């Protein structure tokens, strides 16, 4: 608890100091999914929820523009309603592919209002700079396919070579870590 008399470690945390824990917890959720243990998954999802609540509390205590857990939940509800007109309004989407296409279209309109009219043209727009390179490459290449674009083959080849190098480096790091256990 961050309340007076609560945990001193909790009390000194900031969004920045908590960021690595959020990333770590997300990876633990992925491991739990891959492991197929639903009890472990539930536990790890609880840890993600703790991160959300913790960040909201930090913001609330800092007086950051009335940002608290209610704000976070309200923004989520608003987004879900906006992006599901086939559920909450008179939109029509009867297949998962139609739902995904509608979601992307609505998201593009939202982002264009925030970031300018070039949202659809900018393949990197909205991709977090902190997203690992391999995942960023996957997202950009998926956008290219969805938009029916024909990218420069040399650029695609460079991306693929870089992804292969990343995978090799990741394998090397994992092998080195295994060596620490001996």
Question: PLM features: what roles do these ranges have?
Answer:
Residues 1-44, 50-182:
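Flexible "arm" and connector segments at domain edges
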């Amino acid at each position: 608890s961050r309340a007076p008399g609560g945990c001193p470690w909790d009390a000194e945390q900031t969004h920045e100091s908590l960021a690595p824990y959020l990333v770590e917890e997300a990876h633990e959720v992925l491991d739990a999914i891959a492991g197929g243990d639903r009890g472990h998954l539930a536990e790890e999802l609880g840890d993600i929820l703790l991160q959300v609540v913790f960040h909201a509390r930090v913001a609330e205590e800092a007086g950051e523009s009335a940002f608290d857990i209610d704000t976070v939940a309200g923004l989520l509800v608003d987004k879900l309603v906006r992006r599901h007109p086939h559920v909450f309004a008179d939109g029509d989407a009867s297949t998962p592919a139609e739902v995904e296409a509608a979601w992307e279209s609505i998201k593009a309109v939202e982002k264009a209002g925030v970031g300018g009219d070039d949202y659809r043209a900018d393949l990197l727009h909205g991709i977090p700079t902190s997203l690992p390179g391999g995942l960023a490459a996957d997202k950009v290449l998926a956008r290219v396919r969805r938009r029916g674009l024909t990218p420069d083959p040399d650029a695609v080849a460079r991306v693929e070579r870089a992804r292969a190098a990343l995978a090799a480096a990741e394998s090397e790091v994992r092998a080195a870590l295994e060596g620490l256990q001996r």
